[in-house]
Regions:
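N-terminal presequence-like segments and the immediate start of the first folded domain
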Residues: 1-33, 71-75, 92-105
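Short, well-ordered alpha-helical segments
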Residues: 21, 26, 34-81
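Short, solvent-exposed loop/turn elements at beta->coil junctions and helix N-caps
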Residues: 6-9, 82-87
Length: 105
């Protein structure tokens, strides 16, 4: 599935806009990870465990969005975006969304 952040795809003619598609996931941090991150905050540097967690969440959200687009019969997703929000003290939601389209044959 072709996914792009642009509103169109060079060399392709959009036939039909099928609608908005999205995928989301909520991930909770581990208490031990939070403690280690607090220590890392004091000395500085990348919080690798959080980076890995967010990377996995982005991939899961994107995979779910692509599945939704495939279920609609889409050829691609344009105007792709991510959004992240904190929904609890130790949990974050990642949403991937865009517009599912069909190409002219």
């Amino acid at each position: 599935m072709l996914v792009t952040s642009t509103p169109s795809i060079e060399g392709k003619q959009i036939q039909t806009y099928l609608g908005i598609v999205m995928g989301s996931t909520v991930r909770a941090r581990h208490l031990g990870t939070d403690i280690l991150a607090s220590l890392k905050n004091i000395v500085g540097g990348e919080l690798k465990s959080y980076s890995i967690l967010l990377s996995q969440a982005r991939k899961e959200a994107m995979d779910r969005m692509i599945k939704s687009a495939e279920d609609m019969g889409a050829d691609a997703v344009v105007n792709f975006r991510y959004e992240t929000s904190t929904i609890a003290a130790a949990a974050s939601e990642v949403i991937a969304y865009g517009t599912a389209i069909k190409f002219d044959d």
